[in-house]
Amino acid sequence: MDTQAFQHLLSLFPQLTMRQRRLAQHELTTPHPITSLAAQLPACRCCPHCQAEATQLAPWGWSRGLRRYRCKQCLRTSSVLTKTPLARLRKAQCWEDYAQALIDGLTVRQAAVRCGVCKNTAFLWRHRFLKAMASHQAAREGGIVEVDETFFLESFKGQRGLPRPARHRGGKGRTRGTGPDYIPVMVVQDRAGHHADFQLEKMNAETVIAVLTPLVSSDAVLCSDGAGVYASFSKAQGVTHQVVHNRQGERVVGAYHIQHVNGYHRRLKEWMERFHGVATHYLRNYLGWRRMLERYGREVNV
């Protein structure tokens, strides 16, 4: 707004009624909804566009309640939300309510009703929020490390075209168990509670070795069932391998078992039932969502 227009606006203020003045005062003194969120976000450590150091960022006004900065090197402006899942997201006054809806595990329609937005907005917000969670998991595990895989039926939910004949609700895949209709998800957890899970393209030795090598410490003890892919990894990396068979009386061998990851499989699938099928395209986001709830429960700070 230019100076002349602003002065004209101020000249109209004496004409307001008392109710209108109270409303104007409330709007002027109430902080922007995004301000409370911005206070919890870390300061800009570098330019999100050219990765220049924070010392190269100069204050460049305000926008939607957020301080903007201009990079001295690339001359582009940014804020703490630039290039994050929350960038360009509207209705900031609803973000905390929607974050709480995620903690409560609400469906899209339930979250939409709680936040007063349409279901399409609620769906888009869900995956904006979950995108940030999908990559937050353990980077290194040691001690006794449990590993096991579970399978989800491949789903093209939400897509206009299907590469196969449609299945009716509650249908089953053309193949059983580990066939091409099923997507393997490998869960890894140590006794310290460090947790990681991976949606795999194929359940073979090459894929498992590539995933587990940077995750499992060389001095760890890997506990698994009798699947040969884990034996291949242990042999290739020199990791101690303890096989625990899924048979009565053999599921626990002293301190070695895979009960933690099997329990997580059960809780994950029971929790997923409320969504009546998850598109494989978004499966990683839902894995991150459940991982956050398992680790923090209702103690998540929104």
PLM region spans:
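Residue-level recognition of single "structural anchor" positions
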Residues: 1-302
